[in-house]
Amino acid sequence: MGFRSKKKVIAAKTAAELDAMQAAGEIVGKALQAVRAEAKAGMSTWDLDQIAEQVIRDAGAVPTFLGYQGFPASVCASVNEVIVHGIPSKETILEEGDLVSIDCGATFDGWVGDSAWSFGIGELDEEVQGLNLATEWVLMEGMKAMVPGNRLTDVSHALEVATRKAESKFGVALGIVDGYGGHGIGRHMHEEPYLANEGNAGKGPVIQEGSALAIEPMLTLGTEDSAVLEDDWTVVTLDGSWASHWEHTVAATKGGPRILTPRY
């Protein structure tokens, strides 16, 4: 899969605009931390959604996901073989050993923060733990390419290279989910360009100082292929293998990549 934008550069934000984006991103970070702290077996994914929404609204922000293209909740809650876009539900009850991805967005003063992480309910199986640690590591390694002067697919390539290194580092075989990836972000959650999680380096628009991308590797213990369920949102692995999803909103600066969705 290739890059989808014909623009020669990725739009840049000013220093003040990046600060505004980080203010939104910090709210997202607090929401994610609150969800993880409260999550336990016997709770529903709807319960987790309510926790995140409360944190976002208490901070004076608005849940970006709620109502976005008709999405009915404030977070995406994706469990086990669900890769992304899981709809929180009172019927989805968490069990010990589940791997849960929470993807969350907040809009604050007109700017959007978008971030995700995956975590276990209780203790994870060794292979699943390896998958989750690997996906987090791939995110942190891949974002190192988010520097002025690089091109869009330099980030894609860095993510792919990190994924292959992670297989030996964490002792797991990993599938890179095809057809899903990161994106530009700012006043809107999804802006140009689309960011693939694999590919050749040196292509696509140039990253400028102040360019911002949501970088989000999605890895599985099996297939690269996925399917969308009848709800038109939930994306699952085609072979039932479990998936992990990690995401940060990241800006390119003179000092290197700047995470705009920190979790303090």
What are these regions (language model features)?
Residues 1-264:
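Active-site neighborhoods and metal-handling regions in enzymes and metal-associated proteins
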